[in-house]
């Protein structure tokens, strides 16, 4: 898994690539990267899943932990470009009832305002 951060106005966009699974853990997890942005004062986080091929229960936990951390500070965390396969996983885990998920980045960005 590789994660690159970019900014658009006051929104932090994390472009995630590869597989989000426990066996691919690097030194820094997605949740840690989100927490770093929150600690620096950012409150609008967008996770771009366009290049994500697979997610396991660890990855689902990372997303949920990121959502909770953001929500607890009054921020918003949203997801964009989820594949049908990943969307099914989010449906089964009931995350579609908690998370805002968008098909297009521009729509997701506008939803923050």
Please provide the spans of the model-predicted regions.
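Short acidic-hydrophobic, aromatic-tinged amphipathic segments that line or gate anion-handling sites
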Residues: 100-104
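Acidic phosphotransfer microenvironment of two-component signaling modules
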Residues: 84, 106-107
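A short acidic, often aromatic-flanked loop/helix-cap motif at beta-alpha or helix-coil junctions
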Residues: 12, 107-110
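Short beta-strand/loop segment at the start of cytosolic alpha/beta domains
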Residues: 1-15
């Amino acid at each position: 898994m590789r994660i690159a951060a970019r900014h658009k106005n006051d929104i932090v966009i994390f472009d995630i690539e590869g597989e989000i699974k426990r066996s691919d853990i690097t030194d820094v997890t997605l949740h840690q990267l989100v927490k770093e942005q929150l600690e620096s004062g950012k409150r609008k986080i967008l996770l771009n899943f366009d290049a994500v091929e697979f997610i396991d229960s660890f990855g689902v936990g990372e997303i949920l932990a990121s959502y909770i951390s953001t929500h607890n500070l009054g921020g918003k965390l949203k997801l964009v470009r989820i594949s049908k396969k990943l969307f099914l996983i989010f449906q089964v885990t009931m995350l579609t009832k908690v998370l805002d998920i968008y098909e297009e980045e521009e729509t997701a960005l506008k939803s923050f305002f």
